[in-house]
Structures are given as C-alpha cells and as structure tokens.
Amino acid sequence: VAGGGSFDEIIEKIDIGGPSMLRSAAKNYSSVAVVCDTHDYSQVITELQEGGTSLELRQQLAAKVFARTGEYDSAIGRWFADQAGASLRYGENPHQQAGFYPDSQAVGLGAATVLDGGKELSYNNWLDLDGAVAAVNDLPSPSAVVVKHTNPCGAALSSDSPCDALEKAWEGDPLSAFGSVVAVNGHFDLACAKFMGGPNKFVEVLAAPSFDDEAIEFLRNGPKWGKNLRIVQISDIGSKRNQLESRRVWGGNLVQGSDDISAFDANLQVAGEVALDPSLENDVRLAQVLVKHLKSN
C-alpha cells in the first residue's frame, strides 16, 4: 500500500496461509510454541536449552500472535473501507483533507441516497446532517428538525402532517434557519416542497425517508438555490442507532454505546410539588430532546 501498488497487486499480496498457520498454532498453545516476533527468539531458545518451553511463555506467545494477526486483518479492513469511501473537497477548514467512509453495515447515513442534482455534500454538511437526523430520530412522526453548525435551531412535532411540522420548526428561528440542514421523519411531499421553496428561505441539505417526484422537481426548478440543494433520502430515519460511538483523541479512541433513549419513550417524573399540566407534556419532552442534542448554549 505504501509503495503505491494497484488494487489487484495489493489484493494479491494479502496473506491467507501465514495468518491461518499462526492462529492454528496459537490455538494449540498448550502443546505448541508459536513465534511471530524476532524479539522472542532469545527467550524461546533459552527455555528450549533448559529442556522445553513453559506454559506461561507459550501463552504469552499465543497472545502476541492473536494481537498481531488481528492488527493485520484490521489494516486490511481499513484499506478496503478506504476504497469504498468518498473523498470530500476538504474538511472543517479548506486546508484539511477529508472523506466519508460508510460502515460495512449499510444503515443510516452510510445507506443514504443523495438524489441526482445538487452540489456534493461537504464535511460540514455531513456533520449537520448527522445532527439533524439524530435529533429527529428521537421525535415521533411527523416531526422536523432544523440544524445549523451541528445545533438544532428549530424543531417541532405535529399531529397533522410533515409540512405542518416543517413550518413550525422553521418558525422557531427563521434567521438561524437560513442556510441550514433540515431533516423530516415523514414523507416529503409537494406541500413540504412549496413551503421550503417560499420566500426568505434557503437550505443546504434536505433529508427525509422518502420524497414525492413532484416535490423534487419543484425544489430543483423553483427557488434559485434549488439546483445546488442536496436532497438526501435516508430510508431508516426514525430507527435507533444501536451502534458504538467513537471519538478520536491523541493516541487513542474513546468509545461508548449510542444514547438511544428518547424523552418520548421515558416516563416523566415531576421533581417539584406542582403537577405538570398535561397540555404541556409534549413541550417538555421536546425540550428534553433538544437539550440532549445541543452542543452549545
């Protein structure tokens, strides 16, 4: 890989037999000493000269084999993932290189379909899209979330239609919503498109589980910014993530399970003595969802 070989040349050099023999020997460490590191030669030779290798040494050698073959397989996996990914124009800043590499399990953004037309999704677009989808996943359908700089600046649920939710979410902060990323967890129809294509509106990305053809045509040919709009279809919007989340830190990775608990799935407990007005229950749940997804004050 470092030498710049072609795809076929690199595939040809993937070792199958070597790791298999090492793993087979390591599995039988109780009877076999397997050496994959030249630094272990002297200790193995010393014990052999004394009559035979100890069980403790053989176990240490086996552990090193499984770690080494695991690293080898991981390196191959990362290389394959790189081939399946997409380079982005740049990262958070113009001087940073960036790319998007979907998981092998085709879910969420990794299974999203960017519909024909529109500009390429940028690194920041992907971040905002992830934030919008994560928030709308915590809301009952139909709901809409408007995100700017990874933070929700508008969100609403409706008992009527996705268009109604969209209108209410936009009205939360129309100024911040200008140039935002919007996610809806219901079908995006022509009514939604006509609202979004109205005066004093502009969005970078629209995401929904499904779109009417008439809605797409209206957006592409209506507002001036429609030809550049990224329209993203994510069929499993509304699903729980149920995945490990990792964050790169200097010298390692922090890993935790995804926070899939939504305020709309939990029982509300009143901490004070004043009972909650039932008419405000959805407002309280919505506020809790937004607090969960806000990254600044």
Task: Please annotate each region the language model reported.
Residues 68-297:
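ATP-dependent carboxylate/acyl-activation modules
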